[in-house]
Design a protein with these regions (language model features):
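Short beta-strand elements that form the blades of beta-propeller/WD-repeat-like
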Residues: 3-11, 63-72
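Repetitive beta-architecture junctions, highlighting loop-to-beta-strand starts
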Residues: 4, 16-18, 40, 65, ...
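Short flexible coil/turn linkers enriched for glycine and charged/polar residues
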Residues: 12, 61-63, 74-75, 118-121
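Structural motif
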Residues: 14-22, 75-82
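Short loop/turn segments that connect beta-strands within beta-propeller blades
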Residues: 23-26, 85-86
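Beta-propeller fold detector
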Residues: 30-47, 90-97
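Cap/lid segment of the alpha/beta-hydrolase catalytic domain
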Residues: 48-50, 57, 83-229
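Catalytic nucleophile loop
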Residues: 232
Length: 232
């Protein structure tokens, strides 16, 4: 809680989000009312990317005109920024340095959705160097692809930058992350539906994601490899 607003972390469509809820501080709280009754305008902080991870950073002054936050994505290195409350401007304070002349504009990330055998929608994160799947986003050219999945302990595989990933992206290989049940990307239910007697959902979800990527033309059976391990 801050002076005049709340900052709330939540998840939407399998991604972390940060929402500001501004409070009506011009009137006194009436008997029987709670903080919820003072809630007014709501505003989600957007960093301008389809997929990103965002969270609140250290903010020792509740009345400060800036909100310190951190964010990143599959193509954006970890970044610390200030969100200016007066106009919504995002001011970058520090970003992790990537050696070798890294240019994020050469890469792309997108969200896809596969359909599981029971009808559940399974989110997929696809990361590639631009041009890997051709120039037509509606008719992708098949390319070598690594499909990764985990799906255990309610652990969410949220967008995050990796230098080592660039090596195979630059050589024309794509990465797809299957956010299968057993993880926490879609909330507690997502975890519950992928453990104990429902653990097979983790594996059938993964297969559904593989089938989807092939059917949509992102890769072929001969070009796809898969990776997973541990309890996933």
């Amino acid at each position: 809680a801050f002076t005049g607003y709340l900052a709330v972390s939540y998840r939407k469509e399998a991604l972390p989000r940060l929402r500001l809820i501004f409070l009506d501080t011009e009137r006194a709280v009436k008997p029987g009312e709670t903080l919820v009754d003072l809630c007014g305008e709501m505003q989600d902080i957007d960093v301008g990317e389809e997929l990103f991870n965002i969270g609140i950073h250290a903010n020792p002054e509740p009345a400060a005109p800036l909100l310190r936050l951190s964010y990143g994505s599959f193509i954006t290195p970890p970044t610390v920024a200030d969100y200016r409350l007066s106009d919504g401007a995002l001011i970058i304070r520090k970003q992790a340095e990537v050696q070798g002349g890294y240019d994020p504009s050469r890469y792309e990330q997108k969200r896809l959705w596969a359909t599981a055998s029971d009808g559940e929608r399974i989110p997929i994160s696809l990361i590639a160097r631009k041009g890997t799947h051709g120039e037509d986003p509606y008719r992708p050219t098949p390319a070598p692809l690594l499909l990764y999945g985990y799906g255990s302990y309610e652990d969410s595989r949220d967008p995050g930058f990796s230098v080592s990933r660039l090596s195979y992206l630059d050589r024309g290989m794509a990465l797809a992350i299957a956010h299968v049940r057993g993880g926490g990307e879609m909330g507690r239910r997502w975890y519950d539906d992928g453990k104990l007697e429902k653990k097979p959902n983790t594996f059938t979800d993964f297969i559904a994601c593989a089938d989807y990527l092939i059917a949509e033309g992102y890769t072929t059976p001969a070009q796809m490899v898969a990776n997973g391990g541990s309890a996933g």
